[in-house]
Structure formats: structure tokens, C-alpha cells
A protein has these predicted regions:
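Interaction-mediating elements
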Residues: 1-113
């Protein structure tokens, strides 16, 4: 039931997509969610602006989960996501926004949980 959507400014070749998928798959456990239900959407070549300036390297990340968001877990998740983006893509943490969304209604396979 978790979903991670990442929009980045640069091109993401297949090998980088695979690395990100693997790292996000491990990281989702911080939120108490299983990788077996994780959906990931990687969107590259986006125009992102911060403080009125276009970012050469930047990212916007949305983390969506079934249920409520634990503040402590989201703090740890933000740190981990920024670490992954810095390591794999060279995106500094001050060029990353992360938002969290929790919902009581999540559909899958023809019904809601």
C-alpha cells in the first residue's frame, strides 16, 4: 500500500532506476510498510525551481501510505531518502522536498483495504 513518487531534474538511465528501486524498497520499512506492496514511480527530466531559480540537480518526493503518518518515522525516512538521492544522483539535501500523505482509503485489486 505504500507509494513513492520521485521527480528529478536529470535523466535516469536504467541502471540508476534499478538502484533507486532497490534502495527505496529497503527504505520503506522505516515507515513500517512492506516492500512487497510498494509501488514506485520515477519521473526524470523535470523542471524544478527553488527560490525562484531552476535547479540543475533537484528532487521532489511524495511518500503515500495506507493509514496515518508517524512523525518520527517520516523524519527518519526524509533523512534516508536524501541520503539515497545524494549517493546515487548527487542531489544535495537542500535541493530535495519530501511530502507525506496518509489515507484511510486505498484500493488494490478491485477493492479497498
Amino acid at each position: 500500500m505504500p507509494m513513492i513518487e520521485v521527480k528529478v531534474t536529470m535523466d535516469l538511465p536504467a541502471e540508476k532506476r534499478d538502484l533507486l528501486k532497490a534502495e527505496f524498497g529497503k527504505a520503506i520499512s522505516i515507515m513500517g510498510k512492506p516492500e512487497s506492496y510498494l509501488m514506485i514511480n520515477l519521473v526524470d527530466k523535470q523542471d524544478l525551481y527553488f527560490g525562484g531559480k531552476k535547479l540543475d540537480k533537484g528532487a521532489y518526493v511524495e511518500v503515500k501510505v495506507l493509514g496515518s503518518i508517524d512523525g518520527g518515522a517520516s523524519d527518519k525516512m526524509t533523512a534516508k531518502l536524501c541520503e539515497i538521492l545524494e549517493k546515487e544522483l548527487g542531489i544535495p539535501g537542500n535541493a530535495v522536498y519530501v511530502s507525506y500523505w496518509g489515507t484511510a482509503n486505498w484500493g488494490w485489486n478491485g477493492s479497498n483495504f
